[in-house]
């Protein structure tokens, strides 16, 4: 049986009709060898979908991109690292608009066809003149093999670049989806200090692309947490240009379902890369709450455990302190009954019916010595479940974030 999709090389430039580039504009002072400005374009008309931070304090590029997205078609994304252009008032809005305008003029596009993203330190005005001066070189370097350089250009505290691409075989044709992302610290459900750009040569309406993108983000980036902090800048953008030469995908069609499955794989893999690159992380933990009365209860309990400082510290110390997990479940506001809760570490029972199991502590500690493990919490109140991917909390994380 032919697989629904398979991984290929090329990242965001793997789909037909996309190019990308990166240059050093000088935003990151003192880093002469670090690119800090990236560009992704579709050489053909395209539609876009996006999700933005739910933080009430939204950065200027988030506000400008949301407005541009509503205005119609999208052809390009320009992004900088080293400066968030957040909490910069009306000057920040104007600078974000100038950033889009500089790229639009160089490419012969309308301003609204360019989306802008920024990541970096909050509260500093964007050195827009440096960006404007760098745009001609940025456009000149556009390449169908430019995915990795953009992925590296948007990195901040990341330790490795994050990219992926897949090919989806269809009857007599194929479509491709590519993606890049950045993120390591300040990661929390509902998007946070995370940028993700996805491209596809599939043909799909803007409405359906938004529906699938939103659903995919909910199942991936909104299920990861490193430190519980939510950023002002996070953005996921998906651009589709229809160059795969297949009919437009619609709900109920096999191509639509295969595309949705492949898109979910792309976002989930990028989300896992982000969590594994968490600042100072030594443990990668999947928290799986099942048996909840409702989906919201499962989510509340999973997120409470995943964001608990005490739980995360215990994981760093390789201590199977299930009491801290019980405590977090209890204050999560999810419906629970203490005497019905079971807790497992990689399938090894730690708590049975709310009481200590007979499993030797050394056996549980052996599980926590692994870099990756799963904590399963069964509430035995229903059939709803939810998963969150999280990490431990280390002295290295504290040291890294003592100053910027």
Predicted regions and their residues:
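A structural signal for small-residue-enriched, beta-sheet-centric alpha/beta enzyme cores
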Residues: 1-80, 84-94, 104-404
């Amino acid at each position: 049986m032919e697989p629904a999709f398979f991984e290929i090389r090329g990242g965001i430039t793997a789909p037909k009709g996309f190019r990308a580039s990166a240059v050093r504009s000088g935003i990151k002072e003192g880093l002469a060898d670090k690119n800090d400005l990236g560009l992704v374009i579709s050489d053909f008309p395209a539609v876009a979908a996006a999700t933005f931070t739910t933080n009430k304090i939204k950065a200027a590029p988030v506000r400008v991109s949301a407005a541009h997205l509503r205005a119609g078609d999208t052809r390009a994304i320009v992004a900088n690292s080293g400066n968030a252009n957040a909490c910069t008032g009306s000057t920040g809005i104007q600078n974000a608009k100038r950033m889009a305008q500089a790229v639009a003029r160089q490419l012969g596009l309308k301003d609204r066809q360019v989306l802008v993203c920024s990541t970096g330190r909050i509260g500093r005005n964007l050195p827009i003149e440096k960006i404007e001066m760098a745009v001609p070189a940025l456009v000149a370097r556009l390449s169908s093999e430019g995915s990795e350089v953009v992925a590296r250009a948007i990195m901040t505290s990341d330790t490795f670049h994050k990219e992926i691409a897949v090919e989806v075989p269809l009857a007599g044709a194929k479509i491709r989806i590519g993606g890049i992302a950045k993120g390591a610290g300040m990661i929390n459900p509902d998007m946070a200090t995370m940028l993700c750009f996805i491209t596809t040569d599939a043909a799909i309406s803007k409405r359906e692309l938004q529906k699938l993108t939103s659903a995919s983000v909910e199942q991936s980036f909104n299920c990861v947490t490193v430190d519980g902090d939510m950023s002002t800048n996070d953005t996921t953008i998906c651009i589709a240009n229809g160059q795969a030469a297949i009919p437009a995908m619609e709900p109920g069609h096999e191509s639509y379902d295969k595309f949705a499955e492949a898109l979910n794989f792309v976002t989930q893999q990028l989300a896992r890369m982000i969590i594994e690159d968490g600042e100072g992380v030594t443990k990668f933990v999947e928290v799986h709450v099942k048996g909840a009365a409702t989906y919201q209860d499962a989510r509340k309990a999973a997120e409470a455990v995943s964001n608990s400082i005490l739980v995360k510290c215990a994981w760093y110390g390789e201590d199977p302190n299930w009491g801290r997990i019980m405590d977090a479940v209890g204050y999560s506001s999810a419906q629970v009954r203490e005497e019905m809760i079971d807790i497992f570490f990689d399938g090894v029972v730690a708590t049975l019916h709310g009481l200590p199991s007979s499993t030797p502590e050394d056996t549980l500690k052996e599980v926590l010595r692994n870099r990756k493990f799963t904590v399963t919490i069964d509430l035995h109140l229903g059939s709803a479940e939810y998963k969150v991917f999280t990490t431990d909390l280390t002295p290295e994380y504290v040291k890294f974030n003592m100053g910027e």
